[in-house]
Amino acid sequence: PVEIINDIKKAYENMNVNLDLANVSKQALDFIQTGRDNPFVAVRSSATAEDLPEFSFAGQQATYLNVRKSDYVAQAVHQCWASLYTARAIYYREKNNFDHNKVFIAVVVQKMVDSEKAGVMFSINPATNNEDEIIIEAGFGFGDAVVSGAISPDNYVVDKHTFEIKNKTINNKEFMFYRDPNTGRTNKRILSHDKAKMQVLNESEIIQIAKLAKKSEEYYGNPQDMEFATAGNKVYMVQTRAITTQAKVSKAVAEKFDEIEGEEILSGISASPGVGKGKVKIVNNADELSKISEGDVLVAKMTNPDYVSAMQKARAIITDEGGSTCHAAIVSREMGIPSVVG
């Protein structure tokens, strides 16, 4: 019930911070602050379930960017904990038969990278399971626009062994997120026509990021889904997690389908392989999710974690924006639902 969910969240948000937590938050901030005045930090959730590494929890828990001062850091930690009990997080666990008592959450406080460019890299091709390819998707500013699928990012395919750039797709990136220097808040900026169509990463950056992806996979021992950010001449890896969709993608790729005759009216990126058909339902925002019935084709500008309950009913998913590494793509692959994005 919504009332119970709200009570649990409120209890987390209002709980007294014990001295240990307050000290840990301050120590983390002091460590990051060394040599800087009141640094901005990112407070990131990291959720996992015992013995269930095949689920991504993509977008289910909260992350807070551009947080400043220890009191606000402690508050953000509270809110990360409380995000275990949002309606969408509870639904995700129920639908996947998770024991709520065996789901855990860690909270990471890290330096906030005021990024000029950012995005996502996969150490294998997530749409085909080609283990010899690294996929990089990038946009200008903060990486939120790429991760959420709010823009169609540049896409780079790199050979994992030679680091040769095999393919580049430069898309029209309509806007970027950036930090307002006066308020410290994340703002949206519409890009000029020329900037929107400009290649985000140069060749040196692409190769540097690809090498980082390969190194991460070797360190963890399995394919990784990572987020990166660049500032100055440095590349930062801000998070990584195991790729959770290999088995379902392999099954879909192995299936053979007859080619459908007819005029091609739209094209996009194959984010999750397969074929699906059904009644097309266009969803303009989360308030319209009740439109979706079992077996429909869900069409939207983009998806977010609140769409998961509707996505699970869909026979196929199409979005205007996004790349092969965005939320819609990851969740579609996890559910085994055919999806085209961008």
Predicted regions and their residues:
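N-terminal beta-alpha lobe that positions the nucleotide/phosphoryl donor
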Residues: 1-106, 196-204, 217, 261-266, ...
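Structural motif
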Residues: 40-42, 106-107, 119, 132-134, ...
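Active-site proximal loops enriched in glycine and acidic residues that flank catalytic Cys/His/Asp
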Residues: 45, 111, 138, 228-230, ...
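Extended active-site and interfacial segments that coordinate phosphate-rich ligands
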Residues: 57-91, 115-182, 238-269, 313-321, ...
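Conserved catalytic alpha/beta cores of large enzymes that bind or transform nucleotide phosphates
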Residues: 133-225, 230-232, 267-277, 288, ...
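Feature captures the catalytic cores and cofactor-binding loops of soluble hydro-lyases/lyases
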Residues: 282-342
